[in-house]
Curated annotation (Swiss-Prot):
GO terms for molecular function: uroporphyrinogen-III synthase activity. Disulfide bonds: none annotated. Keywords: Lyase, Porphyrin biosynthesis. This is Putative uroporphyrinogen-III synthase. The gene is hemD. It catalyses: hydroxymethylbilane = uroporphyrinogen III + H2O. Pathway: Porphyrin-containing compound metabolism; protoporphyrin-IX biosynthesis; coproporphyrinogen-III from 5-aminolevulinate: step 3/4. It comes from Methanocaldococcus jannaschii (strain ATCC 43067 / DSM 2661 / JAL-1 / JCM 10045 / NBRC 100440) (Methanococcus jannaschii).
């Protein structure tokens, strides 16, 4: 069975490898590109906390810092949205984060932060302009746009080609963010939409699922909001 991976190319390989091991045929079809902003300065001394809502936020901040500033990050209180972001933070900055919620959403992260932070403490959130405002609106926080999400060139035409490639077989579409889903479904024509409804969609979590539902589709959601959680759902579809 074919499984379409719509996450950015540089983050698709791990998911593709997991799918291959399970006997699926992964198709890497990015509907999003990550573009890092390297022309930024930040005064880390102004902040008590740094909160990361994606691995790209970790990488983006690392890219703009000097060696001394990277060491300084280790002395900050660190909050991350989920397991992959935690692993990325440890890979780049050499230690575990202080906070990670059990449910990988901004709302859950905010609840955990509120339990241990003080009202006067200042937060830095390295993120993208398309980020949700949950943390910004509820914390004493500054956003630092260390990357942006761009739509790949010729995506509309490529989606037409994808339809021809997968239409005759059973397939699964996977989406790991609301933006990957939005960029995909806005170019889906009526014919492709009907084909998709006879197949399967797996969203990484409830926020991504809501975006998909706005386009009239009903995705499946894993219990754990990771690609490994998605794989658990995908395994069950193999038997159908």
């Amino acid at each position: 069975m074919k499984v379409v991976i719509t996450r950015p190319k540089e983050r698709a390989d791990v998911f593709a490898s997991l799918l291959k091991k399970e006997g699926f045929e992964p198709i890497i079809f990015p509907t999003l590109e990550i573009v890092y902003n390297k022309d930024l300065d930040v005064n880390l001394d102004s902040y008590d906390w740094i909160a990361f809502t994606s691995p790209s936020g970790v990488i983006g901040l690392y890219n703009i810092l000097t060696e001394n500033e990277r060491e300084n990050v280790k002395n900050k209180k660190i909050a991350v949205i989920g397991e992959k972001t935690a692993k990325t933070f440890k890979k780049y900055f050499g230690r575990d984060p202080d906070i990670m919620p059990n449910e990988y959403t901004a709302e859950s992260l905010l609840r955990e932060i509120k339990k241990v932070s003080k009202e006067e403490e200042k937060f830095l959130i390295p993120t993208t302009p398309s980020t949700r405002d949950v943390l910004k609106n509820n914390l004493n926080a500054d956003l630092l746009f260390v990357y942006k999400s761009a739509e790949p060139e010729n995506l509309k035409e490529d989606i037409k080609k994808l339809k021809e490639l997968i239409a005759k077989d059973k397939f699964i579409l996977t989406f790991t963010s609301g933006l990957t889903a939005k960029n995909f479904f806005k170019y889906v024509d009526d014919e492709f939409a009907e084909i998709i409804k006879d197949n399967y969609i797996v969203a990484i979590g409830p926020i991504t699922a809501k975006v998909i539902e706005k386009f009239g589709f009903k995705p499946l959601i894993p219990k754990v909001y990771t690609i490994e959680g998605m794989l658990e759902v995908i395994r069950t579809l193999k038997e159908r």
